A protein has these predicted regions:
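N-terminal phosphate-binding or glycine-rich loops at protein starts, especially the Walker A/P-loop
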Residues: 1-36, 228
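Active-site and donor-binding regions of nucleotide-sugar-utilizing enzymes
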Residues: 5-8, 14-23, 49, 60-153, ...
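Structural beta-sheet core signal
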Residues: 6, 34-36, 116, 167, ...
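Conserved nucleotide-sugar phosphate-binding/catalytic loop shared by glycosyltransferases and other
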Residues: 28-71, 78
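A nucleotide-sugar donor-handling region in carbohydrate enzymes
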Residues: 40-44, 63, 140-214
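Short hydrophobic signal-anchor/transmembrane segments that target glycosyltransferases
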Residues: 215-229
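Catalytic donor nucleotide-activated moiety binding site of glycosyltransferases and closely related
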Residues: 231-240
Length: 240
């Protein structure tokens, strides 16, 4: 039986891999081991997701603090050890965070095939760590697993073999559908004194300049039909 080693470490990517083990059990022709790199360790950024989704990491790394470069180095070393001991047929990574880059580099050094979901995206903003990660590990020699049909042509325009680009869908939506009933029954809106049609809060990534990001967020939200009455307030929109 084939084995996939799925590596995640941050809040957004926890949500994207919740169905992987269930799919493996249903198919019966491959197994999944889950690695939590510890990039996000706060209870509200990590533990709560594993508890609510019923996930149990098979490997949990403890990475020392330090500079971003030092942490990336520790991640690569720790993930190399896990890959050696697990001996998977392929390593699966998601997105463009440091855990993704570290796992990709470790897998490449060990000549283990890499499955990269949400790969091949670019936004041209080199002030973002995520964009630097995308550029650092260019995937020209491996398949790309895309989650957005409208952007599948971008890697080909940069020289990627079109036959290596595969649309696989958005695994975060798989999680949304699977937990839809629990979401509807949740009392969290009441706990936070919010209503489905009331104000919403958007938390942007801290990279880049706030002025540029605020313009982009405003343009994106205002372009939606449901946001025709969008108002911006400096009381609620501020850089952190």
């Amino acid at each position: 039986m084939k084995k996939l080693l799925v590596v995640v470490g941050t809040r957004p990517n926890f949500v994207k891999v919740t169905r992987f083990k269930e799919v493996a059990r249903a198919r019966g022709d491959f197994s999944v081991e889950l690695v939590h790199t510890g990039q996000h360790t706060d209870v509200r950024m990590s533990t709560v997701f594993f508890e609510q989704f019923g996930l149990a990491p098979d490997h949990t790394l403890v990475i020392p603090g330090g500079s971003p470069a030092a942490r990336l180095g520790h991640l690569i070393v720790a993930l190399e050890a896990v890959i050696r001991s697990s001996a998977p047929d392929a390593v699966v990574v998601v997105g463009d965070v440091d855990s993704t880059l570290a796992a990709a580099l470790a897998a490449d050094r060990l000549r283990i095939p890499l499955v990269h979901v949400e790969s091949g995206l670019r936004n041209g903003d080199m002030t973002m760590i995520e964009e630097m990660n995308r550029i650092t590990h260019r995937p020209h020699r491996r398949p790309l697993f895309h989650h957005r049909t409208e952007r599948c042509g971008e890697p080909a325009a940069r020289g990627q073999d079109p036959d290596s680009i595969h649309f696989v869908g958005n695994t975060m939506i798989d999680t949304l559908v699977a937990f839809e009933d629990r979401i509807a029954a949740s009392g969290v809106l009441g706990e936070l004194e919010l209503t489905p049609t009331g104000p919403c809060t958007y938390t942007p990534s801290p990279g880049g300049t706030w002025t540029r990001r605020r313009r982009w967020i405003g343009s994106s939200i205002s372009s939606r039909s449901w946001a025709s009455n969008t108002r911006w307030s400096s009381r609620y929109i501020r850089a952190r």
